[in-house]
């Protein structure tokens, strides 16, 4: 069995939801990197961005990956921007098998609108689709270059996606 499974992909593609389901199916632990950071910092990701800035958050994200380097039998859901840092990309590959959950921009926007989660990088809703496309284009090569497996998630059921992941690990 794989030491760990690391889920990467854009915000709102289902990393947390799918990660929990996958962990249950594999009898693995589940770790949400953003929640891990929120507990360590005693504030939400939105508050960290607002009060301390993105650079501070990215540093805490990198430190969190260091702390998770020894975990085993875990599914780890990363933040959408974790792959921005070359150092983080290297750490993710060392932690476990990296799976890229790929989604279409329109599907991402639909999920964001349905979600109660505040997305710090998408505060202006009128510009959201353009911003999603821009950020996704900037990160796509990082997602693809870091991952061993790419799983399309748009317009698919959770069950279909989980089955696809399990068949590919």
Swiss-Prot record:
The EC number(s) attached to this protein equal 2.7.1.71
Which keywords appear in this protein's UniProt record, sorted alphabetically?
Amino-acid biosynthesis, Aromatic amino acid biosynthesis, ATP-binding, Cytoplasm, Kinase, Magnesium, Metal-binding, Nucleotide-binding, Transferase
Instruction: Give the required cofactors.
Output: Mg(2+)
Which catalysed reactions does the entry list for this protein? shikimate + ATP = 3-phosphoshikimate + ADP + H(+)
User: Which lineage?
Assistant: Bacteria, Bacillati, Bacillota, Clostridia, Peptostreptococcales
One GO cellular component term, please give it. cytosol
What name does this protein carry? Answer: Shikimate kinase
Q: Which family does it belong to?
A: Belongs to the shikimate kinase family.
- The UniProt annotation places substrate binding at 34, 58, 80, 139
The alphabetized list of GO BP terms reads: amino acid biosynthetic process; aromatic amino acid family biosynthetic process; chorismate biosynthetic process
Q: Where in the cell is it found?
A: Cytoplasm
Pathway, per record? Metabolic intermediate biosynthesis; chorismate biosynthesis; chorismate from D-erythrose 4-phosphate and phosphoenolpyruvate: step 5/7
Residues that bind ATP: 12-17, 119, 156
Q: What does this protein do?
A: Catalyzes the specific phosphorylation of the 3-hydroxyl group of shikimic acid using ATP as a cosubstrate.
């Amino acid at each position: 069995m794989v030491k760990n499974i690391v889920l990467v992909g854009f915000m709102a593609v289902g990393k947390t939801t799918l990660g929990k389901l996958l962990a249950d199916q594999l009898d693995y632990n589940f770790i949400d990197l953003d929640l891990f950071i929120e507990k360590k910092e005693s504030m939400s990701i939105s508050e960290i961005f607002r009060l301390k800035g993105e650079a501070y958050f990215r540093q805490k994200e990198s430190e969190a990956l260091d702390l998770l380097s020894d975990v085993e039998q875990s599914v780890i859901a990363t933040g959408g921007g974790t792959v921005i840092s070359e150092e983080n990309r290297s750490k993710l590959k060392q932690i476990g098998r990296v799976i890229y959950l790929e989604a279409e921009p329109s599907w991402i926007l639909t999920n964001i609108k349905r979600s109660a989660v505040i997305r710090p990088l998408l505060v202006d809703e009128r510009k959201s689709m353009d911003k999603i496309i821009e950020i996704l284009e900037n990160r796509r090569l990082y997602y693809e270059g870091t991952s061993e497996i790419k799983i399309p998630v748009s317009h698919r059921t959770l069950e279909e996606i989980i089955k696809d992941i399990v068949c590919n690990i």
